[in-house]
Design a protein with these regions (language model features):
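Short intrinsically disordered, low-complexity coil segments enriched in acidic
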Residues: 1-8, 112, 204-207
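Aromatic-lined substrate-binding rim segments of carbohydrate-active enzymes
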Residues: 1-43, 127
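Active-site region of glycoside hydrolase catalytic domains
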Residues: 31-206
Length: 207
């Protein structure tokens, strides 16, 4: 589902009925054909108006706006959709940072991720409240790496690469807490000012 088809600017009080009807027709046809949909709620398609106003998930206002969006679609498609993904390839936020990325770029990327982690956890909570039958999960890009040799240094480097590019996002969403190696990653990139006040309140929620 494209967020901007439901809330074109992201901040409307009422959803776009034409957008809701479009997806209802799609899901109804799938049901008639015996196809069970797996729906991605966000696929790098934040409404442009929000990007221009608040930046790329760098403002906590996104959390409440995403909550409104998911509440709308969970209610609208109850009984038609059971399987949901909160964020598509969420780990690509950090996977595609260049090797020479600045500390500021890393700071923004990890702050961006945290707000999405909280929004994802809230979506799981809301989705289960609306329909206990909902199955809500996360989706990671398969950024798999392998050690160059069996040398312990190569093995450790590969482990740390997997931790940063893959397991960091997976652990938070599957286990509901930041993994122990998160502090190492933050230190390596001089990340010292993350706004993670909601972590205890929300990130324990999982599908």
């Amino acid at each position: 589902i494209s967020w901007s088809r439901i809330y074109p600017t992201g901040e409307e009080e009422k959803p776009n009925q034409a957008g809701l009807d479009f997806y209802r027709n799609v899901f109804t046809e799938l049901r008639n054909a015996g196809i069970e949909p797996l729906v991605s709620i966000w696929h790098f398609d934040t409404p442009l108006a929000l990007e221009e106003k608040y930046g790329d998930w760098l403002d906590r206002k996104y959390i409440a706006l995403y909550e409104k969006y998911v509440t709308t679609i969970f209610n609208e498609y109850k009984g038609l959709v059971k399987y949901w993904l909160t964020f598509n390839e969420i780990n690509n936020t950090i996977n595609f940072l260049p090797d020479n990325a600045s500390d500021e770029a890393y700071q923004e990327a990890y702050q961006h991720l945290h707000y999405q982690f909280v929004a994802s956890a809230r979506a799981v909570q809301i989705g289960h409240e609306i329909d206990p039958e909902n199955k809500i999960g996360c989706m990671l890009a398969g950024a798999i790496t392998y050690p160059h040799t069996c040398d312990p240094k190569d093995m450790l480097l590969n482990q740390q690469t997997m931790e940063e590019n893959f397991w960091y996002c997976g652990d938070v969403q599957c286990f509901g807490a930041y993994p122990p190696f998160a502090k190492r990653i933050w230190k390596e990139h001089n990340i010292t000012d993350l706004d993670i006040t909601e972590a205890v309140s929300y990130t324990h929620l999982r599908a």
